[in-house]
């Protein structure tokens, strides 16, 4: 018995020692992967020393002797603090997540491989201007230097038992492409839905369900559109469920297997922690939302269907402020995540054209890209919201009756291009995916009638893709900023800007296709050449608004303009204008502004869009109605 007790005590002691040793090892691994916050770091390739100072919030100020040196230092910072996030962004766009986290990431990888963004990024890299390429190369070298200077790789790779792959210049372009995926409809689902509705529903029903606007619209140019009436019983009778639908169309709720649900992820208990590589991969994949049933939720890259996406910005002219300086406010509503999407920084280097004053960029950067996304250069300040304009079109393909491997083009019959995409998968053999392409873009799934389609999307145009705009970094006026951003190869954004002279303005940041022969609302054939994209709008053709009479500008993902300007932008499923209405009303309610007043609008909690429904509920849930039903009483308590 004593022998057994002694053996048990020895075993317990060994387990305790192993646990303590494991804890020390884990702590050491985690500590060694943390960024260097002080001291000196040797980085090859710098033309002169760079200083990095952090404020009380840890926000770095980077001061160097050249744009390339500052880009290199920013790469070091991004790599040491956000490399895993950067890795996920490039892999998301390239369709290479499964190589990191295993087979659970195959559905989103398969879905995105149709775009062949790795090839797009490589073509874009080859087309960069020498100045932009030099900045990108310096940033890339900084990323790899920062990563290699860590004592151990970021802890996520330790858990996955993987080694981080070096950063490539093309990877920064993939990060830009990942934002296209986040901010635009990369499957053509909105246009496809509209086409189906037009095909199977009465026109009155389509007008009601997919109106051109709502009573909440508060555009900068033009009035709100009239609201279509609710279709009467002669169109669709809710009591008898009779409608003027074609006989082959059935209206029914979706079956269970046709619906998607958000993964119900729960953190494991200590006894459930993974012990194998596969288990860790599965856990991390589940935590990030990499689930075949919901690829749109993965990795914090929001799809267009995610209602959490939305942003607000507005500006007031200097003539309305207390000190005569124009003001810009911006809040970008990407999904809240840890770490945050953005990385705040102050970047500074000498102005080659004016040695007496430096170029200063203050605001937020995107890990993986060597540029300031939103902020100020001390002469102008700018902010973004997603436009929800129409950035893609579905093309109906006409197949050769004699050879289904050919499709009609304005130049005659043409063979489909076929590509064998190899998806590497951690822990198992790679998977091969066959992708077909046309002169307009990749072939996607057929429509509801079985007709083949291709997707024409601005993100596929490599020659317009970029990572940094030197012209925006040095712009001094609203007009110079307009010229800098019109035509850039980035996701189309509402660009609201103010300059130090007190001027304000709005335009579109990004490349706008020039549609010919159609409006882009529903899919059509481009085979005879009468319809299609005829290049891109010139800067002089872009919608621009400078110093409106009201002295106020606002955008919130809703429609901003009407008439010819709206025709050029198209409708990519604009948001209901309730946020824009609230912002406009709050701006119009004041005659003078200070920064605090703009912050008060940002902190607004009034949900005006819901007020009418609250009033209707309270009117309906009378004391006599709720008296006999506890659930109704609870509902009234919630909305009172």
Language-model region placement:
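Hydrophobic alpha-helical segments
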Residues: 444, 488-590, 626, 631-632
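Ordered core of a single globular domain
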Residues: 197-203, 463, 471, 476-482, ...
